[in-house]
From Swiss-Prot:
Annotated positions binding Fe-coproporphyrin III: 131, 145-149, 172, 185
Protein name: Coproheme decarboxylase
Active-site annotation: 145
Superkingdom in the source lineage: Bacteria
Similarity section: Belongs to the ChdC family. Type 1 subfamily.
Cofactor note as given: Fe-coproporphyrin III acts both as a substrate and a redox cofactor.
Gene that this sequence comes from: chdC
Gene Ontology MF term list: heme binding; metal ion binding; oxidoreductase activity, acting on the CH-CH group of donors, oxygen as acceptor; peroxidase activity
Organism of origin: Staphylococcus carnosus (strain TM300)
Amino acid sequence: MSQAAETLDGWYSLHLFYAVDWPTLRLVPDEDRIQIVQEFHDFLDKLASVRDDHNGDHALYNITGQKADILLWVLRPEMQELNSIELALNKLRIADYLVPTYSYVSIIELSNYLAGKSDEDPYENPHVKARLYPELPHSDYICFYPMNKRRNETYNWYMLSMEERQKLMYDHGMIGRKYAGKIKQFITGSVGFDDYEWGVTLFAQDPLQFKKIVYEMRFDETTARYGDFGSFFVGHVLPEETLETFFRI
């Protein structure tokens, strides 16, 4: 049996995608709509309060295209906290006008494919901790997609030796390093949590960088032979102070 990769696991992750029911929201009187949006704003302020204690983070984005209008990405130390947050959101009046279109449950993950040998506790390494328990960059643009490692009769990632996988992941990672300073990447593991094995969340100031890195990686052996992908979601940051304008009709 091939050796399984070990992982370092950080905060639990929940991507929530919603479409806005604009026809129904249009029937709401302006005064009521303003109160509904303010209640949503207060909810987001409460989510943000954990940042000061470094107990999680969240990001809010306006998704481009018809797959969704809004993405709320939440990170917390415990999965149960994600349940509580989603429940609280569902109880808000704004939820009457938000139609769930997709969600993704996972956990911030680092693998040991590229790790060197050390007796150090990785969870005490400041660089590792910053990646497992991140402060999100809130860049202008976001891209999210789920993915699997292919396993079929021709190409099966899980039948490769650890050495083969390490070599492939090293080459794969070298492409990613070319985009340092242009793209911030977060990998979340979802085996046993959701329909795919990983989620990939990218942040950038220029959305064209998403196209460039994904296209370049198509020619990498790790992706070309062993990568299967779900839907891609891309969007622009939705500052909370602009919510009233966003929901105004």
